[in-house]
């Protein structure tokens, strides 16, 4: 059984849907070297609601949130003033990534989702 992490309002869902549309444009603009992932915190077991270039990590819509994204979420929740800054990471095959995790705030000022951007450093 899928246990919700948070309950989303209709407005929260509308906010996340607007980000999903933005991902299409960002993906077209930035190109194949970028993986863009939109997470909804309504269900951590199926948090990925939109993904562009998921072939780099093998993720798809309906995939669960990663341990790293959960760690970043915890840091963002503990320190709301924390600025978003890029960091380096590796995917499962060991390829170097430059990543950024951006919190998405909903109707009541709480974090309802995450926008994760991963640039694959070995991309042409």
Name each region found by the language model.
Residues 1-29, 113-115, 119-124:
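Juxtadomain coupling helices with adjacent low-complexity linkers
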Residues 3-7, 17, 50, 54, ...:
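Generic alpha-helix detector with strongest preference for long hydrophobic helices that associate
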Residues 9-11, 57, 66, 83, ...:
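Residue-identity detector for threonine
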Residues 25-85, 90-92:
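Structured interaction and signal-relay segments at domain junctions
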Residues 72-124:
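Sensory/regulatory domains in signal-transduction proteins
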């Amino acid at each position: 059984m899928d246990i919700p992490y948070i309950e989303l309002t209709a407005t929260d869902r509308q906010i996340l849907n607007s980000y999903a549309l933005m991902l299409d444009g960002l993906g077209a603009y930035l190109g194949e070297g970028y993986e863009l992932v939109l997470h909804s915190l309504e269900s951590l077991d199926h948090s990925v609601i939109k993904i562009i270039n998921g072939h780099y990590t093998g993720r798809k819509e309906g995939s669960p949130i990663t341990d790293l994204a959960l760690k970043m979420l915890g840091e963002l929740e503990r320190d709301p003033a924390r600025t978003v800054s890029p960091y380096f990471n590796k995917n499962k095959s060991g390829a170097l990534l430059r990543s950024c995790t951006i919190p998405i705030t909903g109707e009541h000022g709480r974090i309802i989702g995450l926008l994760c951007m991963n640039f694959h450093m070995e991309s042409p």
